[in-house]
């Protein structure tokens, strides 16, 4: 049987290259944050001058860069812990999310009038310092759009669902809208793919909504498109 292609993986945390790691797990989903777990050997980390008692303070909130044979993933460390068992010197466990996690603000309320989807999403990503490629199929300006008791990322997720736009993280950028066309990549089950599922799904009916703007005594109506773009 054919074997999955092996890629050289390198790792950097808070600007420090890690010589090795015990375990690395990266879970990627469309429309969601990506999640990772890294287990490091304490002795290997100490070689690079990392002070173990201060590792939590020094690493939490810092950038984590993974290089999978030229494919880059950039994330943020959100938890660092020390694990010891069986009398061993122990391991350091680092968990975190894609840089999109910076959009997890407090639940807030905001509104926009006569702004496009691009304007709204770019405003939020720029404010959070998240690199984004914003190119929605919906180009027209929206009469009225509001964010109500949602995090910034939750609001962007809702906009993607409401207007049936792509939303995913490509390892370095949050992509909102139709991705740029690229070259065709051939994937073979048993080589590049270890699991393959094929299915069909019935979608909900288009979303309709309306809101009243008391300042100018106007009612605004909106509807999601009937068909997904892309």
Regions found by a protein language model. Name each.
Residues 1-230:
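Amphipathic alpha-helical and helix-coil boundary elements used as assembly
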